[in-house]
C-alpha cells in the first residue's frame, strides 16, 4: 500500500503530469488519423523519450496508449471508419447514432464509457495482477485454437440475419490473411510472382480500405435532393438532441458495462488478444441478453456503451501480463516492453 501511495503521488508531480498531458495530446492526434494506431505512435515517438527520466518517458507512452485507443472511436463513430482494430465494434451503433442526429451524445458516450473502462482495467492491473497472469499463463496452443474458432463463430452472430453474407465475408478475410509467405514452410501463397506481396497485406490497410473507401463510395451514391434534405434534418436534430445519455439509459447500461469491463480486462490479459476481440464479444453478448436485441446495430445506447468500455478495459489486462510475466498482451504492449528495456527495466516477476 505504501508503494501504491508513493506511485500515486509521483504521478501528480509537475514534470510527470506535464509529460502525461503531452502524451495524451499526441495520442489524440494519432488515434484520429486513419492508418495510424497506438502501436505505430508509440514505436515512432519512443526514441524521442530517451532523454527523459523513466517515469517521464512512461508517462508519455502510456498517455499515447490510452488516448489513441479512445480517439480511435471518434473516426469510427463520425465517418464509420475505424482507425484501429479496437474501434471496429464502435461502428456497429455509433455511426447509426450519428445518422440519427445524436452526434454529441455518441461522442460524449465514447468519452464517458472509455474512462469507465480504463478505470476498471486499472483496478484489475493493481488488484488482480497475479491471479489474472497465472490464468493467462495456462493458455497453450489448444486454448488459443479454441479461441480462434470462437472468434470465427462470432461472424455468424454479428452478421444478424445475413448468415450467408457473414460466412462469405469471413472466408474472404481468411483468404486475404493467407497472402504472403507461410511462416512454417516459407512457401509463397497468392503472391502471383509479386515480391511486394511476400509480407502479406497489413490488417490496417485492409480495414481502412474496406470501411473507409466503402463509406466514401456509399456517401457519393447518396448525393440527391432527398438525401440532402435528410442530412439537413439530421443536422437540425443534432442541434436539438440531448448531449448525454438520459438517466434511464445510463442506469440501464450499468450492469452490462460492469460485466463487459471485467470480461474485457480478462481477455486483455490473454496474450494475442486485443480490444477488437473484447469489444465484439461484449457487443454480441450484450445483444444476446438484451430485452431489445433488435435495436443493436441500429444505434443502441448499450451497444456503444459496452464497446467503448471494452476496448479501454483491455488496456489494464494487457498491461497485467506485460508487467508481471513479461509477455505482451497485444501489439502495443510488445512495443512498450522494448521501451521499458531501453529505460533499464525488465518486465516480469522480478519487477515485483
What are these regions (language model features)?
Residues 1-57, 130, 134, 188-300:
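Helix-loop-helix hairpins and the membrane-proximal interhelical loops
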Residues 21, 25, 41-43, 62, ...:
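Hydrophobic alpha-helical segments embedded in the membrane of multi-pass proteins
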Residues 24-38, 68-80, 155-160, 261-271, ...:
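Transmembrane alpha-helix interface/packing and boundary motifs in multi-pass membrane proteins
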Residues 38-48, 61, 76-96, 126-127, ...:
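Re-entrant/interfacial helical elements at transmembrane boundaries that shape
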Residues 55-59, 96-113, 290-303, 334:
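Membrane-interface alpha-helices at helix entry/exit sites of multi-pass transporters
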Residues 66-71, 112-124, 132, 176, ...:
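Membrane-embedded alpha-helical segments of transport systems
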Residues 104, 108-117, 255, 259, ...:
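Alpha-helical transmembrane segments of multi-pass membrane proteins
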Residues 108-224, 340-352:
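Membrane-embedded alpha-helical modules
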Amino acid at each position: 500500500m505504501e508503494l501504491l501511495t508513493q506511485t500515486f503521488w509521483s504521478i501528480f508531480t509537475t514534470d510527470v503530469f506535464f509529460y502525461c498531458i503531452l502524451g495524451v495530446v499526441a495520442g489524440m492526434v494519432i488515434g484520429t488519423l486513419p492508418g495510424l494506431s497506438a502501436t505505430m505512435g508509440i514505436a515512432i515517438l519512443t526514441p524521442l523519450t530517451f532523454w527523459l527520466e523513466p517515469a517521464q518517458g512512461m508517462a508519455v507512452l502510456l498517455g499515447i496508449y490510452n488516448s489513441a485507443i479512445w480517439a480511435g472511436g471518434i473516426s469510427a463513430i463520425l465517418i464509420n471508419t475505424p482507425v484501429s482494430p479496437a474501434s471496429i465494434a464502435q461502428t456497429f451503433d455509433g455511426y447509426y447514432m450519428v445518422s440519427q442526429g445524436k452526434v454529441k451524445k455518441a461522442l460524449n458516450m465514447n468519452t464517458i464509457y472509455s474512462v469507465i473502462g480504463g478505470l476498471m482495467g486499472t483496478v484489475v492491473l493493481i488488484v488482480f495482477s497475479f491471479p489474472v497472469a497465472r490464468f493467462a499463463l495456462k493458455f497453450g496452443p489448444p486454448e488459443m485454437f479454441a479461441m480462434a474458432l470462437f472468434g470465427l463463430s462470432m461472424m455468424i452472430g454479428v452478421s444478424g440475419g445475413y448468415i450467408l453474407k457473414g460466412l462469405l465475408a469471413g472466408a474472404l478475410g481468411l483468404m486475404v490473411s493467407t497472402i504472403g509467405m507461410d511462416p512454417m514452410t516459407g512457401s509463397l501463397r497468392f503472391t502471383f510472382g509479386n515480391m511486394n506481396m511476400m509480407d502479406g497485406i497489413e490488417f490496417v490497410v485492409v480495414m481502412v480500405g474496406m470501411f473507409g473507401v466503402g463509406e466514401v463510395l456509399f456517401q457519393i451514391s447518396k448525393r440527391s435532393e432527398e438525401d440532402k434534405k435528410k442530412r439537413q434534418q439530421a443536422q437540425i436534430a443534432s442541434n436539438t438532441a440531448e448531449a448525454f445519455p438520459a438517466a434511464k439509459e445510463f442506469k440501464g447500461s450499468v450492469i452490462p458495462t460492469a460485466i463487459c469491463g471485467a470480461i474485457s480486462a480478462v481477455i486483455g490479459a490473454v496474450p494475442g488478444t486485443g480490444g477488437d476481440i473484447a469489444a465484439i464479444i461484449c457487443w454480441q453478448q450484450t445483444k444476446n441478453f438484451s430485452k431489445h436485441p433488435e435495436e443493436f446495430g441500429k444505434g443502441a445506447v448499450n451497444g456503444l456503451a459496452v464497446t467503448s468500455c471494452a476496448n479501454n478495459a483491455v488496456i489494464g489486462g494487457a498491461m497485467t501480463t506485460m508487467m508481471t510475466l513479461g509477455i505482451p498482451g497485444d501489439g502495443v504492449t510488445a512495443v512498450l516492453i522494448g521501451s521499458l528495456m531501453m529505460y533499464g527495466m525488465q518486465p516480469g516477476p522480478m519487477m515485483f
